[in-house]
Amino acid sequence: GYPSQAQGMGGRQVRNGKDHGEIFDHHFVEFTYDSGAVIASQCRHQPGCMRRVDETLQGSQGCVNTKTGKLTDLEGNEIYKYKSDMLNEPNPYQVEHDKLFASIRNGGVIADAENGAKSTLTAIMGRMATYSGKVITWDQAMNSDMQIMPESLDWDSNPPTMPNSNGSYTIPTPGVTEF
């Protein structure tokens, strides 16, 4: 399933010049599911810092980190670690493409549009939460009139956010920015 709500924080500390548009350079989002499960997602785009883009699933008996492939108990003891054999395992991106191309050749259908759209909305909901500083529900994100796409998709289209006369962009401010 998909999260029922998101809350988070983020900001611009390093990438704050006119050449960086409106984007934050770090985000931390907690996605909460109807079951009560919470997934913590974080990213940072700051030169000279540890770069981290991953998700952590915290349960009542332990924790899973998607980047390390480790499952630990509540005391941090390793219960399981995915053992990768990088030399003999196929590249997952290549496997995905192989399946897609085989499906096309054989007249099959891989119907991932709904999953792709809902996964994208999940990411947008997280960004809405960090930019606004508010808890954003799935329904609020789904029904929002926020426009992040150009009005038309052609080579002459402008993005929905343009710089002002000084070349600066309006930067989202948590607690002020609406979604």
Tell me the role of every PLM-derived stretch.
Residues 1-179:
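Contiguous beta-strand/loop segments that form the cofactor/metal-binding neighborhood of enzyme cores
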